[in-house]
């Protein structure tokens, strides 16, 4: 479907606004994803405070050319959507898309992204997506600190039981 010049300009401005406000961006290929699953994913993402927008590759590249990101833009193959987050958790968009990618059997794929003002490859964005959330990391840290203390308390308890006998 042909898009007139005004509509193209509007799309480029929208994507540019997304890029300006986003803390991180994930480029996804959604070619094999049915509309019903796309709708489900959009609702899930929206509930998490993550945005999802679709744009033609040429218009996306035009919006990206206005921004100075380090690195090389990953190859944008297939039908491209931009998943972006504007909140404190910079890894949330990548994590949510990665979870949906595993759930959908690979019908949607991460093809790259922008993290900390640097273009990232597919593998780098997948690594970022596999990092647990801040809450989980804090819980793991507390567990690591707490384990030796628990062992020490058990040892003291056993010693006190032996002495009381």
Over which residues does each language-model region extend?
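Charged phosphate-binding loop/patch that engages nucleotide di/tri-phosphates or the phosphate backbone
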Residues: 143-165
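Positively charged, polar, low-complexity stretches
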Residues: 1-114, 128, 161-165
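A short, charged helix-loop
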Residues: 110-134
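Short hinge/gating elements
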Residues: 29, 81, 123-130, 138-143
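Acidic and generally charged, gly/proline-rich low-complexity regions
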Residues: 94, 98, 127-131, 135, ...
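Short amphipathic alpha-helical segments with heptad-repeat character
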Residues: 2, 9, 16, 139-146, ...
């Amino acid at each position: 479907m042909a898009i007139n010049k005004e509509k193209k300009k509007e799309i480029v401005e929208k994507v540019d606004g997304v890029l300006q406000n986003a803390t991180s961006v994930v480029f996804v290929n959604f070619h094999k994803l049915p509309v019903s699953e796309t709708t489900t994913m959009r609702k899930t993402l929206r509930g998490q405070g993550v945005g999802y927008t679709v744009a033609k590759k040429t218009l996306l590249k035009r919006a990206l050319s206005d921004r100075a990101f380090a690195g090389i833009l990953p190859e944008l193959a297939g039908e491209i959507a931009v998943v972006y987050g504007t909140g404190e958790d910079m890894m949330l968009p990548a994590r949510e898309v990665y979870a949906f990618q595993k759930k959908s059997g690979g019908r949607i794929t991460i093809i790259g992204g922008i993290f900390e003002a640097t273009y990232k490859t597919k593998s780098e964005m997948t690594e970022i997506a596999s990092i647990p959330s801040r809450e989980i990391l804090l819980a793991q840290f507390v567990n690591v600190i707490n384990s030796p203390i628990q062992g020490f308390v058990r040892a003291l308890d056993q010693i006190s039981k032996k002495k009381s006998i």
